[in-house]
């Protein structure tokens, strides 16, 4: 998804009723992605920690909580590595687009439970307290103080990152990339999109088959699931 976004493309059409992956430009992005593995020899299933600590893989892409893994499992290279923005795409004006696909985590209230107990307002107040900058910052600092480097906690907001226990050398980078993050739209049926793209990728790389054909034949599964879910919720579909 990062490669799609860096090239200015969107995963779904304007009203989120179908995927745009059937467009030639987006298919070429998928093809370029798979060719890192089929043509340039990258491995798609490796033990990143082991390969990184030995120098076999000098550069890897992951979420910032991977700092924990390296700090604990590879102490012998402590201070010899750092983090940076994801590799970007050069634009026509010479600038580099570092847009990175972001994962979404949520907190929620089970309404049927709290309404039954008459605790709706209290549940909402708790959720606001838990996700507040002060609570998240304090929790991350106290957790790290109690359990050490392994307890680095992915806090719920930017202010908590700024005030939390993340090392300054990492904090500066993490804060600088926040404006580059772009989340995948969460639409009815979208859970199948990532799964389908991943399956097409694995098939292409494992069987060394044509990436565009492999992706194309899977698109009906995405659009059909989106249509079915939108019909289930009484929403308009791409066919209307």
Question: Regions from the language model: what does each represent?
Answer:
Residues 15-45:
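Glycine-centered hinge/linker elements that transmit conformational signals in sensory
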Residues 102, 168-222, 227:
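C-terminal capping/gating helix-and-loop segments adjacent to ligand/active sites or protein-protein/ligand interfaces
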Residues 1-16, 96-112, 193-202:
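Periplasmic solute-binding protein
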Residues 64-78:
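A ligand-binding cleft/hinge motif common to bilobed small-molecule-binding domains
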Residues 58-63, 82-84:
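Paired acidic/hydrophobic, glycine-rich loop segments that form the ligand-binding mouth/hinge
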Residues 46-60, 199, 203-207:
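Short helices/loops that flank or line small-molecule/ion binding pockets
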Residues 31, 35-41, 74-147:
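Extracytoplasmic/periplasmic substrate-recognition and gating elements
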Residues 223-240:
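Short, low-complexity disordered leader/linker segments with a strong preference
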